[in-house]
């Protein structure tokens, strides 16, 4: 059977070779009896691996085919053990070929040594999964929670603190936004942490409640404004118009009374009709005295001064002195008093001008009233 020891020698081997399983010389080494099919020239029989390969096709083809089958069935590496031969023992041909495949140079020795690597506690996939778990872990103290944001809310001063789960970068961004607002907004608002959909839904619920209350207040205010507008149009404007008409009627009545009083005074009737009219007459008399002041006798004094000045002028022209009885020298104080009197008279004339203007306006009103009365009649 194939692979068992036989008494007959193998094909292509000399008859003097030892029995199967015993050590034999390496492949390609010179032998006393040349192999089958090799030339008798010793130069060819003692050649290297290439010469023996081409000189003995049968002996070299079988190990190559079987070696390829073994490589297909069980892949080997340069650092693994040496493959065995077809007969269960190590073949020197395979050993030599393997050494030639491992090292390009026969005398060189290839040594490799890997650097020590620290053991990885978690793989990259495990770390990614752990990061995703931490990002979705809803915990108030979890700084890596993905669903968190800082929103501005109206907060009392005693509750304005930094949340524990907020990073410094996020807090700095929120504070910079707060500093960019107006002073009134900075006093009212403060960053508030919102985590997850639960806090967001609660915040939306509160905002909806505030919006509803604000809308109710706006509706109430609008209804109050409409009510005030209706009251203004229905009550206030007519009241103002009635008061204006009443004022005009009172002015007409006052003008009529004044005309009656003037007519009675012209006829010599100066007696007051009522106590209030008597008091009013006294007040008017006092005001008239204050207006006239010391200039009541101004005209008489002016006439006396004119007479004295004419007499002095005539005496100077005649070259004789004229003594006027009662003539006195006018000192500076008298001139100052006269200037004051003239100034007061000027002011009194201005007041009289204003009185005349008012009288003219009253006359226009009276004329208009007479015209209306004539038209009514």
UniProtKB/Swiss-Prot annotation:
Repeat found in the keyword field: yes
Swiss-Prot/TrEMBL GO biological process terms: mRNA transport; protein transport
Region of interest called Disordered, as start-end residue ranges on this chain: 1-104
GO cellular component term, pick one: nuclear pore
Sequence repeats (start-end): 2-3, 11-12, 20-21, 27-28, 36-37, 49-50, 87-88
InterPro entries in the record: Nup54/Nup57/Nup44, Nup54_alpha-helical_dom
Biased composition (Polar residues): 19-32
Compartments, as annotated in UniProt: Nucleus envelope; Nucleus, Nuclear pore complex
Residues covered by region (7 X 2 AA repeats of F-G): 2-88
Record key words, sorted: mRNA transport, Nuclear pore complex, Nucleus, Protein transport, Repeat, Translocation, Transport
Compositionally biased intervals (Low complexity): 1-18, 39-104
Subunit-level organization: Part of the nuclear pore complex (NPC). The NPC has an eight-fold symmetrical structure comprising a central transport channel and two rings, the cytoplasmic and nuclear rings, to which eight filaments are attached. The cytoplasmic filaments have loose ends, while the nuclear filaments are joined in a distal ring, forming a nuclear basket. NPCs are highly dynamic in configuration and composition, and can be devided in 3 subcomplexes, the NUP62 subcomplex, the NUP107-160 subcomplex and the NUP93 subcomplex, containing approximately 30 different nucleoporin proteins.
Comment block on domains: Contains FG repeats mediating the translocation through the NPC by interacting with transport factors.
Family: Belongs to the NUP54 family.
Protein name: Nuclear pore complex protein NUP54
Organism per entry: Arabidopsis thaliana (Mouse-ear cress)
């Amino acid at each position: 059977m194939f692979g068992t020891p036989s008494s007959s020698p193998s094909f292509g081997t000399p008859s003097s070779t030892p029995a199967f399983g015993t050590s034999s010389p390496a492949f390609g080494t010179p032998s006393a009896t040349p192999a089958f099919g090799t030339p008798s020239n010793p130069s060819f029989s003692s050649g290297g691996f290439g010469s023996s390969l081409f000189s003995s096709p049968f002996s070299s083809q079988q190990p190559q085919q079987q070696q390829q089958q073994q490589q297909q069935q069980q892949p080997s590496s340069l650092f693994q053990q040496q493959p065995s031969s077809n007969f269960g023992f190590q073949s020197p041909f395979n050993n030599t070929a393997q050494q030639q495949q491992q090292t390009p140079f026969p005398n060189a020795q290839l040594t490799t040594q890997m650097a020590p690597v620290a053991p990885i506690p978690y793989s990259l996939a495990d770390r990614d999964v752990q990061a995703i778990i931490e990002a979705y872990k809803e915990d108030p103290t979890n700084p890596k929670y993905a669903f968190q944001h800082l929103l501005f809310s109206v907060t009392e001063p005693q509750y304005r603190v930094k949340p524990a789960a907020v990073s410094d970068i996020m807090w700095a961004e929120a504070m910079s936004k707060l500093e960019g607002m107006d002073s009134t907004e900075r006093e009212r608002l403060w960053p508030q942490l919102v985590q997850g959909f639960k806090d967001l839904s609660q915040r939306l619920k509160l905002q909806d409640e505030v919006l509803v209350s604000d809308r109710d207040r706006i509706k109430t205010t609008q209804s109050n404004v409409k009510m005030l507008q209706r009251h203004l149009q229905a009550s206030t404007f007519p009241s103002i118009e009635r008061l204006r008409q009443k004022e005009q009627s009172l002015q007409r009545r006052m003008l009529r009374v004044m005309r009656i009083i003037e007519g009675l005074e012209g006829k010599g009737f100066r007696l007051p009709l009522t106590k209030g009219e008597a008091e009013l007459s006294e007040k008017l008399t006092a005001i008239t005295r204050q207006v006239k002041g010391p200039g009541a006798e101004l005209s008489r004094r002016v006439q006396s001064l004119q007479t004295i000045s004419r007499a002095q002028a005539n005496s100077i022209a005649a070259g004789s002195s004229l003594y006027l009885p009662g003539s006195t020298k006018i000192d500076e104080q008298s001139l100052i008093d006269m200037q004051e009197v003239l100034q007061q008279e000027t002011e009194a004339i201005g007041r009289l001008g204003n009185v005349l203007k008012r009288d003219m306006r009253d006359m226009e009103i009276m004329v208009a009233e007479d015209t209306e009365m004539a038209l009514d009649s």
